[in-house]
Swiss-Prot record:
A molecular function (GO) term: ribose-5-phosphate isomerase activity
Pfam families, per database record: Rib_5-P_isom_A
Organism: Jannaschia sp. (strain CCS1)
Cellular component, GO annotation: cytosol
Name of this protein: Ribose-5-phosphate isomerase A
Record-stated family: Belongs to the ribose 5-phosphate isomerase family.
Record flagged with keyword Electron transport: no
């Protein structure tokens, strides 16, 4: 039951429920990765099961693809569908301009490719992810394994010339071993604390040999849905310049997400 969920889980739940209202029958939908995105995938499964909607999902990770298949969503590759009507994904941070830091789940490369291949990107979040300036959450950077320590040194040297508060990078681990992305790459987490010029940082990072992609998602998000534990949501549409406040009805018998809490 939703009453058994923590306040943060309830907030993610209502954001996901509101976000899937953008999905229409026959759409090709990009499926994000992470705990919040997992709730959204379950909601899509409910639409398929209860309303008979035909939805084609393009997953940004193997674990999202597995979950989507489990709940009845048809999964295809981006090469199969070429272009998407909509992508729904979570975020690790968002600023007032709806710029994002993503990649905490390790799927930033696939997430950025899918988001940029979509007509619209809807981001779901809870209020704890809001910041005045990006950088409190470590910035993930995907790098190739070959020479990664040299790449790390080049990144840290570059950071000394930019307007950031922190300048250290750490290799992401999974247990005692380096974390590997679905592409077999590594992730360096940059501990910057504040990013004054995210566009400049993104450009410079991607020019460093060995860097595949970074977790700055700039000017990509079209709509941000912020869920609250009391069932209210705030919907920010950057293209229309609107901010709307709504309520999502959540039945106390609804238990779609109890088993996917992280």
């Amino acid at each position: 039951m939703t009453a058994e969920l923590s306040p943060i889980d309830r907030a993610k739940y209502v954001a996901a429920r509101r976000a899937v209202e953008y999905v229409e029958d026959g759409m090709r939908v990009g499926l994000g990765t992470g705990s919040t995105a997992a709730w959204m995938v379950r909601c899509l499964g409910e639409l398929v099961r209860d309303e008979g909607m035909q939805i084609t999902g393009v997953a940004t990770s193997t674990r999202t693809a597995d979950l989507a298949r489990d709940v009845g969503v048809t999964v295809k590759t981006l090469d199969d569908v070429r272009w998407l009507d909509l992508t729904i994904d979570g975020t690790d941070e968002y600023d007032p301009n709806l710029n994002l830091i993503k990649g905490g789940g390790g799927a930033l490369l696939h997430e950025k490719v899918v988001a940029t291949a979509s007509d619209q990107m809807v981001v779901i979040a809870d209020p704890t992810k809001q910041v005045d300036t990006l950088g409190a959450f470590p910035l993930p950077v995907e790098v190739i394994p070959f020479g990664w320590q040299t790449t790390k040194a080049l990144i840290e040297e570059m950071l000394s010339n930019l307007d950031v508060l922190g300048r250290s990078a750490s290799l992401r681990l999974s247990g005692a071993e380096p974390f590997r992305t679905d592409e077999g790459n590594l992730i360096l987490d940059l501990h910057l604390r504040r990013i004054a010029q995210p566009a400049q940082l993104s450009l410079v990072l991607n020019q460093i040999p060995g860097v595949v992609e970074n977790g700055l998602f700039l000017d990509i998000c079209d709509v941000l849905v912020i869920g609250n534990a009391d069932g209210t949501v705030e919907v920010r549409d950057i293209n229309n310049g609107t901010i709307e406040h709504e309520r999502v009805d959540v039945a106390e018998t609804d238990n779609l997400f109890v088993e996917v809490k992280e």
